[in-house]
Swiss-Prot record:
GO CC annotation: cytoplasm; prefoldin complex
UniProt family annotation: Belongs to the prefoldin subunit alpha family.
Keywords: Chaperone, Cytoplasm
Source organism of this protein record: Thermoplasma acidophilum (strain ATCC 25905 / DSM 1728 / JCM 9062 / NBRC 15155 / AMRC-C165)
Protein name: Prefoldin subunit alpha
Pfam families xrefs: Prefoldin
GO molecular function, one term: unfolded protein binding
Length: 130
């Protein structure tokens, strides 16, 4: 019976680890989305004397960025559309709320798993005391 309990505890631990990884990924995405919202919402980009544009592989080129015109936004399957800065900020704010909701669901799921782990562990500990 002890091996079954150990296997069950290991399985729950792996689920908790997976949830933690998903939460970490979503937290990083949330920071990136919030940074983009901040960048589009304030005038720092327009007033910055030097702008570097990533061209990949850690290389950057100096360039000019105009965010007063439409932004080009990916909508999936390699398709892009033009979108106003204001519309982009609205969409990003909605994305941010969706990410926060997903994080909350994962935190709830994690709590359930931790409770389940503690219950299994306590039950086994009680059996071993008897």
């Amino acid at each position: 019976m002890a091996r079954d309990v150990e296997a069950q505890l290991n399985y729950i631990e792996s689920l908790i680890s997976s949830v933690d990884s998903q939460i970490d990924t979503l937290n990083k995405a949330m920071i990136e989305v919030q940074s983009t919202i901040d960048l589009l919402s304030n005038g720092d980009l327009a007033s910055s004397p030097e702008k570097l544009i990533s061209i990949g592989s850690g290389l950057f080129a100096k360039g000019n960025i105009t965010i007063d015109e439409d932004l080009i936004v990916p909508i999936g399957s390699g398709i892009y559309v033009a979108e106003t800065k204001e519309r982009s900020v609205e969409r990003l704010k909605k994305n941010l709320e969706d990410i926060k909701a997903s994080i909350q669901k994962l935190l709830d799921q994690r709590k359930t798993l931790v409770d389940q782990y503690n219950t299994v562990y306590a039950t086994e500990a009680t059996r071993n005391v008897k």
